[in-house]
C-alpha cells in the first residue's frame, strides 16, 4: 500500500489534512477534513504543480495529463484532478471521503509532488455554461492548498 498526505493551509484561516491511500493498481482513496470554510460546496481538485511560492496561485491548472475538458468525477471527459465538491457544514468543516481511479500515487501519472486545492465556490462540474466551466468549473478563488507528499 502506498500512502501520501497533504497539509492544507492558507492566509485565510482555512486548514486541514488530506490523506491518500492506494492498494496496488487500485483506485486511490482520499480522506480527511478541512476547517474554516464557509458553509456549502467547495471545488476540490488536484492541481498540476506542487509549487506554493506564490500561495495557492502557483499550483497551476487542474492536473490534466490526458488533455481533457473539466468535468465531474464520474464523467469520462474530465481532468484527472477533478474531484468534484466537498461540503462544509454549518461549523465550516468539510469531511472528505472520495475514491478515484485517475489520481494514482505511483507510475507515470502519479499525483505525488502535486497540490490539492480547496476553492471558495462550488465546482459546476463543467456544466454551468460559464466561460470558465470547461476549464475550472468556475469554482472561484483558491482558499487552501497543500503539496501531496509520500508518507511512511
Swiss-Prot record:
It is found in: Cytoplasm. Disulfide bonds join 56-145. Cu cation binds at residues 45, 47, 62, 119. CDD domains: Cu-Zn_Superoxide_Dismutase. The keyword Metal-binding applies. One of its GO terms (biological process) is removal of superoxide radicals. Its cofactor is Cu cation; Zn(2+). One of its GO terms (cellular component) is cytoplasm. Zn(2+) binds at residues 62, 70, 79, 82. It catalyses: 2 superoxide + 2 H(+) = H2O2 + O2. Keywords: Antioxidant, Copper, Cytoplasm, Disulfide bond, Metal-binding, Oxidoreductase, Zinc. Binds 1 copper ion per subunit. Binds 1 zinc ion per subunit. The keyword Lipid biosynthesis does not apply. One of its GO terms (molecular function) is superoxide dismutase activity. PROSITE patterns: SOD_CU_ZN_1, SOD_CU_ZN_2. Its main location: cytoplasm. It comes from the Eukaryota. Its EC number is 1.15.1.1. Destroys radicals which are normally produced within the cells and which are toxic to biological systems. Belongs to the Cu-Zn superoxide dismutase family. Homodimer. This is Superoxide dismutase [Cu-Zn] 4A. It comes from Zea mays.
